[in-house]
Amino acid sequence: MSRGRRLRSPSVAERIATSGVADKIDRVSTVEQTSASRTIDVLDHGFVRLDDVMADDLSVVNAARVSFARRKEAMDDSDGGLIRFLMRERHGTPFEHNSFRFHVRAPIFVAREWFRPRIGSYNEFSMRYAKATDEFYVPAPEDVRTQVGKPGSYSFEPVDDELAQATRDELAAVYAAAFAAYERLVEQGVARELARAVMPVGAYTEFYWTVNARALMNFISLRAAETAQREIRRYADAVELLFAEHMPVTYEAFVAAGRVSP
């Protein structure tokens, strides 16, 4: 067993204050802590829940040191240096021997952006087998925006209050009409797998996502970036916060390396 000085575990507040996550906290809503899970509410009806976790910084250290037939029971200062070296030199496999399982509720269009990198394992709610719910994403007034510029070189700007409210009203009306059509079709005997075709991509879905730290960092680098759509950035911010809590040394090395997965 190593005789090096054991690292003091910084508090969540300390990690957030020094990691850059603090700038993003206002993008996510309330946080619920229970003995079984950690939940962050996102958007109007969504959430990210850390359903299960088998991950810490020591798992990275031991995965790397197994090449030398070494194993440690606790972190010390040298281990932080090792993790930073692995991150900086892009030695990625030691970051794969761990697991996070998330339960997510998000609009369908967010879920499709989430699945696109195809990292991790997914199981999603199916409107083929279960009745659809009438929960839909209606953006907050400040999130209604207009696109300025050309594709590949554009920015988003807020709209005036009148257009923001008109947009919200229009979305709510479309959602109500779509769900009413869905219910009519089901009541008339149309199979759910076909009736679901009328449901818009603003409808909420749920899924489980199991992922290791290396893939998780890749997701964060893509979906928490300023170029990602605002709605999925809110979810990525929540995922990032939960990742930082469980693997603080790895997370700090990730940020120091330019937020690029090894």
Regions found by a protein language model. Name each.
Residues 2-262:
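Family-specific signature for flavin-dependent thymidylate synthase
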